[in-house]
Amino acid sequence: MKTVTFLGCGSWGGALGKLLSEKGLDVTMWHRNLDVVNHLKDTRTHYLIPELIFPSGVEFTNNISSAIQSSEIIILAIPSQSIRDVITKNKSSFNKNHIIVNVSKGIEIDTLMTVSEVLNDVLDGNHRSVVTLSGQVMLKKS
């Protein structure tokens, strides 16, 4: 079974993580905030979308290096402005065999680089499989 780690579990990452878990993949969700991680573990409900309930198999952690190293597929669901910092700080946790899927939206403001370009820059072009999944923005009804 494929193992997937989501870096970021906001509304977009959370929805995708739930879907992949329901499709049979082993999913770990990383969030930098331990209080959010504890809420997710304790309630199995998303902190931004209470009607989003995670299956029992989804794991939650704030240990990013362990989450990266234990997975085959890394899905980047963090704000595009945070990608460079997060990847740079955790570069040693990645290996060239990871499949990296970017689902973050936008470009890096300071450089005008796409997330794929930022990843190539930070990871020195050493990763064979870097892809981007894009789609509509999720809007909340008012």
Segments the model singles out, each with a brief description of its role:
Residues M1-I53, V58-N62, K89, D110:
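NAD(P)+-binding Rossmann beta1-loop-alpha1 motif at the extreme N-terminus of oxidoreductases
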